[in-house]
Amino acid sequence: MKNVNSKQNNHSTIGEQDIHFFHEGKHIYAYEFMGAHKASEDGIDGIRFTTWAPNAKSICVIGDFNHWQVEDKNHMKRITDAGLWSVFIADVKDGDKYKFVVTNKDTNHYVYKSDPYAFFSELRPNTASVISTQTTYKWHDEKWLKKRATADYYNSPMNTYELHLASWKTKDDRFMTYEEIAEVLPKYVKDMGYTHVEFMPLHEHPLDASWGYQPTGFYSINSRHGDLVGLKHLVDKLHTHDIGVILDWVPGHFCKDQHGLINFDGSACYEYQEPTKAINKGWGTHNFDLGRNEVKCFLISNAMYWINEFHIDGLRVDAVSNILYLNYDREDGQWVPNIHGGHENLEGIAFLRELNGVLKHTCKGVITIAEESSSWPNISTPVEQGGLGFDFKWNMGWMNDTLRYISLDPVYRKYHHNLITFSMVYHYSEKFILSISHDEVVHGKKSLINKMWGDLWNKYAGLRLYMSFMIGHPGKKLIFMGSEFGQFIEWREYEQLQWQVVDEYHTHRETLNFFKKLNEFYKAETALWECDYDHKGFQWIDANNSEQSILSFVRSNKDGKEKLIFVCNFTPVTYYDYHIGVPDAGSYIEAFNSDDLEFGGSGQLIADEIFSTPESSHGFDQRITIKVPPMATLVLKLKK
C-alpha cells in the first residue's frame, strides 16, 4: 500500500493522485480529503464535502446552513465513474450539522445518511454529522513518542488497565468530559502501577449497551464525553504520565442503523454484496467487504487517523475470528466456501496482513493486538514470515482454563490440574497477552472476585492468589476496571464503578493496596517481563503436584542473573516443611507474598532467610524447605 499523504492547504479540488490511489485501495490518508474539509473557491470560504457512493443517482448535502432543504446548488457532482462525489458549499461553519440525501440510481429511493468520514457527530439519539475543522492541539508528549519509536515491547513491562470511559466514573449523574477524565485517570493509573490503558471503542455508536462495538461513525469520536480536542488532551496527559494508550478498534463489522453505513447508496456498498457474507446474525450487524478497494482505504485510513491525530499507541483489533472465517458463528448452509473450497476468508486474511504491514512500515512503535479465540496459526508472526503481522494475541485459552479452575472447590482441583498448567504447552506459539477483560465480568459471568471459590475470606485470598499467579506466568497482562478493588457486582455500562466500597470496607482497600503493590513488584523485577517469549525466561520446578494443587516455577531475566521462585498454593491449607528444588545455591528471601496481613491475608510470612542445601530435588542440585501459605502465591529470590 502506497504511503500517500494528500495534505494540502486547499481542499477545493481533490488531486488526481488521491483519486487514483483511493480507487486502487492504496490510500492510507483518505480522511484528509474525504468527508468535510475547509476550502475556498473564488475567494469565498466554505466546506468541500466528498463521499463515495458508486450506485447513487444523486447526492445532496442538507444541514443547518440551508435549513435542511434539498437545493440544486448543494447537489454533489460525480467526479469519478467509480463513485466519488464532491461539492463546495459556501458559508458553512464549524458546528453546523449536516447529512447526505443519497438517491439510488436503480430504485430512485433516497435515504438520509451521516457522513462516513465525519470527525464529529450529534449525541444519540440524534444522528447528524457535525462540521469539525478546528481541531488543532498543542501536544506535550514528544518525549513519549520518541521513546515509543524505539521501544522493545516484547522485553518491557506491559500491564494494561482496560476501561469503559462512560462507566469508569461519572460526575453528578452525567458522563464526564475528556478533560475531566484527564484530571483523574492518568494519576490513578500511574499511582496503581499500570503501564498502559486500553479504552473500549471511542468511535461514535448509537446504543450505549453495545459498549462501542457496533459503531456508526468510525471517524467520529464518542460525543458523550466531548470533542476532539478534549480527547487529544486526555491522551496527552496519559503520555506525560508515562502511560501508553491502546484503543479497541472494530474493522470487521458495523451497526445497521439506517443513518450509518448500511446500504449507503441504496445498495450494498461498505458491506459484502452476498447476504451470506454481509449479514452478521449473531451480533445484528453487517460485515465489511474487506476485498473492496475503497472499503480497505476507509478502514486502513481510519487506523492511521486514530494513530496520527490522537497519538494512539496501539490498536486491539476486535473479533478477528469474524474476519478470518467465512463460517464464523454460522451453521452449515449459511456460508459459501472460498475458491479453494475452504472456510478461510481470503479477503479478510489479506486485509489484516495489509493493515499490519502498513502500520509496521509507517507508525514506528505502534502495536496491534488480536482478539482471536481460535487456533489460527502465526497470528503474531511478521507478515514477511507468512504470518498475519500482529504484535500480540490475547490468550483466550489461558483465561478460560484458569477461570474455570479457580472457581472449583479446592477439594476437586487436583482432578483438573491440567487447566492451570496447559497454557505453557503452547505459550511460545504466539506472543500472548494474558487478558481478564470486560467480557468476563458481565452477562451473568460474575465479577472477577465472585468467580473465586469459597467464603468471603477465601474469595479475597483466591483473587490475590490468581492475580499474583498471572503476574508470574509468561506473557503481558491486562485486567478490567473494578477488579483492582474487588467489586462484587458485575460491570454495568450504565453506571459508574462502586468506588464507595473502597471508603466503606477495609477489605476493598486492602485489595486495592494489593494490586498496587503487585503492579509495582512486576515493574521492578526484570525477570517478570524481559523474557516473556523466550524459553529461558521460564522453567517449571514442579508442574505435577496435583495432589496438593501447588505449582512452582522459576522466572528469569535476559542474562539469567535475576531469578524469582514462584510457589502457588491453590488450597486453603498451610503446608510446612515443603521441599522444592532451586537453580542456585545460597540464601533465599521472601520477595512477595499475597498472604501478607496488609493485603487481608493470614500473615503466613517468611521472615528469615532460607538457606539451600546440596540435595537433589525436581531436577535441581539445590533444595530449600519452606512454609507455603494458604490460598496464596509466595515469591522468593536469592539474597544478593
From Swiss-Prot:
InterPro entries, A to Z: A-amylase/branching_C, Branching_enzy, GlgB, GlgB_N_E_set_prok, Glyco_hydro_13_cat_dom, Glyco_hydro_13_N, Glyco_hydro_b, Glycoside_hydrolase_SF
Any one GO molecular-function label of the UniProt entry: 1,4-alpha-glucan branching enzyme activity
Keywords from the UniProt entry: Carbohydrate metabolism, Glycogen biosynthesis, Glycogen metabolism, Glycosyltransferase, Transferase
Pfam name, any one: Alpha-amylase_C
Pathway: Glycan biosynthesis; glycogen biosynthesis
EC main group: transferase
EC number: 2.4.1.18
PANTHER family, alphabetized: 1,4-ALPHA-GLUCAN-BRANCHING ENZYME
Function: Catalyzes the formation of the alpha-1,6-glucosidic linkages in glycogen by scission of a 1,4-alpha-linked oligosaccharide from growing alpha-1,4-glucan chains and the subsequent attachment of the oligosaccharide to the alpha-1,6 position.
Protein family membership: Belongs to the glycosyl hydrolase 13 family. GlgB subfamily.
Designated name of the protein: 1,4-alpha-glucan branching enzyme GlgB
Native species: Francisella philomiragia subsp. philomiragia (strain ATCC 25017 / CCUG 19701 / FSC 153 / O#319-036)
Gene name linked to the record: glgB
